[in-house]
């Protein structure tokens, strides 16, 4: 799949040919907080993607995410203006979770993940995220997959989040997750760059005016070059690809 970087004003979502065969398309936005773009994925971009899918397919379209606290995401969807016609809005915490083995025999941190069945039952998977940089690492389409994992299984004590995974080394975990939960397409909403330190809800904003699309690892590499950061999980994914080819 060819990676593309276009001006946001010129962006029209043209789905890859294989999407035409899908009966169920799952879109994973970045929607964990009730704060607008660039903290979360904009409804404008999601609408453009939905329109593009509808032009070539009558597939069921699902939008799914979860909150870092493990609380219901529906009030957050409402706050973000996620109101789409004939699209099923799902809360990851309501899913049935199935343990899926990491295909890497020499995995980095996690041998298997608890994955929502709604992801496994979808035929085409799209990760849609803002352009976020935290200190020296980028949070792009691969890192966006973390909130598909159940807080109930990965929290530590009573606090929310995925603390047990962070303790294993989140960059290694993200590389393992990429192989265990392979997404077909990454879309990075880089109309603005969002730069933050510790709190993903507070940061600085820079205008950039682009939309990036492509295979998640490939497009994240392009985004990391634009941001001038080295993402360890993207390097580990490169090494993992070599392992799978051997």
Question: Where in this protein do the model-derived segments appear?
Answer:
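N-terminal and secondary-structure boundary signal
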Residues: 1-246
């Amino acid at each position: 799949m060819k990676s593309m970087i276009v001006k946001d004003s010129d962006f029209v979502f043209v789905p890859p040919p294989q999407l035409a065969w899908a009966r169920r398309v799952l879109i994973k936005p970045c929607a964990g907080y009730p704060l607008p773009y660039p903290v979360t994925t904009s409804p404008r971009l999601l609408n453009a993607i939905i329109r593009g899918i509808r032009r070539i397919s009558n597939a069921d379209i699902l939008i799914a995410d979860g909150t870092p606290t493990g609380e219901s995401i529906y009030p957050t969807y409402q706050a973000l203006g996620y109101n789409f016609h004939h699209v099923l809005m799902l809360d990851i915490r309501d899913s049935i979770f199935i343990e899926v083995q990491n295909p890497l025999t020499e995995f980095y941190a996690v041998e298997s993940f608890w994955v929502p069945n709604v992801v496994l039952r979808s035929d085409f998977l799209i990760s849609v995220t803002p352009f976020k940089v935290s200190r020296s690492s980028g949070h792009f389409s691969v890192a966006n997959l973390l909130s598909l994992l159940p807080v109930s299984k990965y929290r530590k004590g009573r606090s929310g989040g995925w603390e047990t995974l962070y303790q294993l080394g989140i960059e290694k975990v993200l590389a393992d997750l990429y192989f265990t939960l392979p997404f077909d397409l990454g879309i990075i909403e880089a109309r603005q760059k969002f730069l933050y330190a510790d709190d993903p809800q507070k940061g600085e904003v820079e205008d950039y005016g682009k939309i990036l699309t492509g295979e998640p690892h490939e497009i994240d590499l392009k985004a990391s070059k634009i941001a001038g950061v080295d993402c360890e999980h993207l390097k580990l994914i490169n090494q993992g690809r070599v392992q799978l080819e051997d």
